[in-house]
Each structure stands twice: as C-alpha cells, then as structure tokens.
Curated annotation (Swiss-Prot):
GO biological process: negative regulation of DNA-templated transcription; response to antibiotic
Tagged with keyword DNA-binding: yes
Domain HTH tetR-type intervals: 30-90
InterPro entries in alphabetical order: DNA-bd_HTH_TetR-type_CS, Homeodomain-like_sf, HTH-type_TetR-like_transc_reg, HTH_TetR, Repressor_TetR_C, Tet_transcr_reg_TetR, Tet_transcr_reg_TetR-rel_C_sf
Top-rank taxon: Bacteria
DNA-binding region per Swiss-Prot/TrEMBL record: 53-72
Lineage summary: Bacteria, Bacillati, Actinomycetota, Actinomycetes, Pseudonocardiales
Designated name of the protein: HTH-type transcriptional regulator SACE_5812
GO molecular function: DNA-binding transcription factor activity; transcription cis-regulatory region binding
SS bond list: none
Purpose: Transcriptional regulator that inhibits erythromycin production. Directly represses the expression of SACE_5813, eryAI (encoding polyketide synthase I) and ermE (encoding rRNA methyltransferase), suggesting its direct regulation of the erythromycin biosynthesis gene cluster. May play an important role in regulating secondary metabolism in actinomycetes.
Amino acid sequence: MTAKSKTSTSEGAPGAVWFRPEKQSRTKPLLTQDKIVSAAVELLDRDGVRQLSMRKLADRLQAHATSLYWHVSTKDDVLDLALDAVFGEVRLPVESGPSWRDDIIAFMAELRRVLLDHPWAAALASTRPLAGPNALARSEFVYAALAAAGFGRADVLAAGAAVSNYVIGSVSAESVWRHQDEAGTRSALAEHLRAREADYPALAGNFPADGGDWQAHFDRGAQYLVAGMAATAGLE
C-alpha cells in the first residue's frame, strides 16, 4: 500500500495499522516487522496481552524501543499484527469437502485448535476489527462456502458472524477455565448450585462438576449451529 487510505479510523485505534501507508526505507533494516510480530506472539503466548509492552518487546529483540516505532506506531499495531499472524496459522482446505456443512465444521475445528494454541488470541479478537490479510482470507473462505451453498446475502452475513462468534466465544471461555484452578472452581460452583437447587434446578441438575469434555461440547454445539443455519436459510 503506497497511498494513504481514506478512513475514519483513528490513527491510534485498534485496526488502524491496516489502513495506514507502509513506510519505505532506502536501506534494508536489521529489524523487520515480521521479526517484531514473531517476538510479540512469543511474548503474548507466555505472558498475555496485559503484560506486553514496547519495552519488553524491544528487550526480546535486543533492540532499542525507539527502533520499533519505524515499523509499528502503537501497542495496538503490535496486537493487530500478532493476531493476524495467528489467523495465518489456520489451515484452509485445498479442495472443498463433500458438503458445505463439512467445510464449515472443519474450519471451526481448525480455528479452535489454533486459538487454543494462543490463549490470548480469542479474547483479543472480540475487541478489534479483524481486517488483516490472514483474517480476511479466512472470512472469505467462510463467506464463499456459504454463498456457494445457496445462502442469500443476509444469511451469509448472519451465518458468517455466527460461525466466528461461536468459535471465538467458546475458546475464550475455555481458555479462562483452563488457565485457573478449573477443578477447584468447578467443584465449588457445583456445591454452590446444589445448595441452591431450588433457585437453579436446571443448572444444578446439568452442571458438569468434572468439566466434561471441552472438545465434545464444542463439536456438539457446532453441529447444532450448522443445522440451525441450514434450517433458517431453507437449505435442509
């Protein structure tokens, strides 16, 4: 991108990095945006979003903090770029599967796998526009699969959002549970519900004190979602 894009996005806002012109250098820099992003993902995987700072990132790269600002303007730039790098890990099929349902469910499973590998990514994805090239390519895959299946424009938009929101939301919840004392918290909550069974009979009777099977719960929910999408769009 060589000319500045016309956009109402604030220069320092999440997502602004995608609409800002790239800086051109006459010499080959020792520090590159790819190196910055790779280091950022490593730090985010280790410490999470709150602990990431430009200074820590510079230390990781053995560089001066000011040298980062040639490539990125803010921490939000770094987060946007790192998140899009994670979306780039989501593998897309070379060929379509037996049906659009298979393609969508396979995509959801693959997106879940990648987001669980980077526990910070799902929660971050819900806070900013996913406008990077990798995220857009994955959205294009979903939209194209739905359109080819016969979904109308309004249904493509709604179903596409449902797919991403289901995966991002479920992974966000799973990541929170897994990065605390899940067994202890579930046991305490189960006891709390049993003591108040008159107030919460359905919860007390169905809450999985042992945590259940996250993968099985996700897969079952994905089947419900896709079946509902098909029924709503009249494609059963």
